[in-house]
Amino acid sequence: MKKERVLIRFRPEIYECFELEAAYQGLRVGTVANQLLISELNKAASVKPEHCVVFGSEDYAAIPEGKRSSYYVLPESKDIIEYLPEQTGKRGAKPINKQVTFYLMEDQLETLKKIVRIQDIRKSMDHGQIITYRFAVLGLLLNNEALDRKPPVIH
């Protein structure tokens, strides 16, 4: 089976979480980041498609009491956008945002596409076509406990 490559840049606060986890596990940063994303994709794929909702949305508010454990809840777009990398302005300047290449199987990529559509963040699609996975990937990773140690973003 062929794997698809998805390249995503991360803020230093997020990348440092990958580095800490990689040091703890004795693995490479990219390997750890891939494991974390695939873990979250598997969690999202394990629930019914209609049980994957965005925190604070109408669908989230409609979750019956006591049924939250059967749902996969994505962070709000404002929380995802807060952790998106800033654009580096100077040409030739070394970017502070580190890139990670994710390798996804076809079924994992399909789950990621569903997440993009569920999030419905304007910048991730153009006329129904997905143009970036960065919001979906970051949203999934923010749900992982390995990123719980990330510091707040200081603007």
Model-identified regions with their sequence ranges:
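Extended, non-membrane alpha-helical segments enriched in charged/polar residues
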Residues: 16, 98, 110, 142-146
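Short, contiguous, well-ordered secondary-structure segments
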Residues: 3-6, 17-21, 87-88
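Short helix-capping and inter-helix turn/linker motifs at the boundaries of alpha-helical repeat units
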Residues: 8-9, 103
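Surface-exposed, Lys/Arg-rich phosphate-binding patches that contact polyanionic backbones
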Residues: 11-31, 35, 54, 81, ...
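Long, contiguous alpha-helical segments
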Residues: 84-94, 98-105, 114-119
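A general secondary-structure signal for short beta-strands and their flanking turns/coil
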Residues: 3, 95-97, 134
